[in-house]
């Protein structure tokens, strides 16, 4: 395959027939060689997929023919290799999980700010700039002077708002996330809580990096993405970070040189959190992956039970690593 096009897309829209879209959408993606995951719910569609330019163009055209799925918000970036292993279309209760009932971006949402106007907004000293992403995302890159809520999941964001933000004190609040979808709900939530002037970066960080010249940019570092690239730089190319296969935390080359790093088994973030049983399981998984690589295959696991357990281990270790990271920062 030539250069791979990675497409992050979403749209909040009433989709009462979302379940009936699943099978034909999956069939279209599989026939076009598109990999990645799309989520469908009664509130819309969300996900990231990858394929050839023609395949992605055809997918967007196919979606536009479905009731309500025209004019989908999407951002394109590129990679030399396919960043996903599988093709999935999942049915969900929400396309982005905040855990608060009744939040509807179709009814109320913050003010969209174009990337070209973002610098001016966040340079206003009266504006509180809040990063709505998770702690491990913030660690590798964020906007200058942005507040880090130190959340491990988006579900924790409402609690952060209740504990740290006040409509009477914070008159102007600007928020951002990777592609814009989390801000649809976070700004809607703030509006529901009585905040008056609430803004968010239209298209998210990815759109900002695409449209704003690097010499004019207020972005510092790289942007975490939820695929095998781990992070992208300002040119939207694969960045310098790798990812620990045990805990999923982004890691640098320096961290990979640490004695705590064992490929597929541990890294400095999670080495103290892994049990001996988990270590043995990770070592076996890595061995199978290496064997598959020698055969020119992608190891995705033939034992369903082992795959499920591995995912549970990854989530558990990620949580522990994030807590460890937060505690380390708090203790400074």
Swiss-Prot record:
Residues 310-319 have a biased composition (Basic and acidic residues). Residues 123-217 form the Rhodanese domain. GO terms for biological process: tRNA modification. The keyword Secreted does not apply. It catalyses: uridine(34) in tRNA + AH2 + O2 = 5-hydroxyuridine(34) in tRNA + A + H2O. Its EC number is 1.14.-.-. InterPro entries: Rhodanese-like_dom (IPR001763), Rhodanese-like_dom_sf (IPR036873), TrhO (IPR020936), TRHO_N (IPR040503). Residues 302-332 are annotated as: Disordered. It is an enzyme of class 1 (oxidoreductase). This is tRNA uridine(34) hydroxylase. It comes from Shewanella woodyi (strain ATCC 51908 / MS32). The lineage of its organism: Bacteria, Pseudomonadati, Pseudomonadota, Gammaproteobacteria, Alteromonadales.
């Amino acid at each position: 395959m030539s250069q791979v096009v990675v497409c992050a897309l979403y749209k909040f829209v009433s989709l009462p027939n979302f379940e009936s879209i699943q099978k034909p959408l999956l069939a279209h993606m599989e026939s076009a060689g598109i990999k990645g995951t799309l989520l469908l719910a009664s509130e819309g569609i969300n996900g990231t997929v990858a394929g050839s330019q023609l395949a992605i163009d055809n997918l967007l055209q196919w979606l536009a023919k479905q009731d309500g799925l025209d004019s989908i918000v999407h951002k394109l970036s590129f990679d030399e290799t396919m960043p996903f292993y599988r093709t999935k279309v999942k049915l969900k209760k929400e396309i982005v999980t905040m855990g608060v009932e009744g939040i509807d971006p179709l009814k109320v949402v913050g003010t969209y700010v174009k990337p070209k106007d973002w610098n001016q907004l966040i340079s206003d000293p009266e504006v509180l700039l809040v990063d709505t992403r998770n702690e491990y995302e913030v660690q590798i890159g964020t906007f200058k002077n942005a507040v880090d809520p130190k959340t491990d999941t988006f579900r924790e964001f409402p609690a952060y708002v209740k504990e740290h933000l006040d409509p009477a004190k914070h008159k102007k609040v600007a928020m951002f996330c990777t592609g814009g979808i989390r801000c649809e709900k976070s700004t809607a939530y703030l509006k529901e809580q009585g905040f008056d002037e609430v803004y968010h970066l239209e298209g998210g960080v990815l759109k900002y990096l695409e449209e704003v010249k690097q010499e004019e940019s207020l972005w510092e570092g790289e942007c975490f993405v939820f695929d095998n690239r781990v992070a992208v730089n300002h040119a939207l190319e694969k960045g310098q970070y790798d990812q620990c296969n045990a805990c999923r935390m982004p890691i640098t080359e320096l961290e990979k040189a640490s004695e705590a790093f064992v490929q597929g088994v541990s890294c400095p973030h999670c080495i103290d959190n892994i049990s001996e049983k988990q270590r043995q399981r990770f070592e076996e998984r890595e061995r199978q992956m290496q064997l598959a690589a020698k055969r020119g295959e992608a190891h995705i696991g033939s034992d369903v039970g082992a795959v499920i357990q591995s995912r549970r281990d990854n989530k558990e270790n990620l949580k522990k690593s994030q807590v460890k990271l937060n505690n380390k920062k708090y203790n400074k």
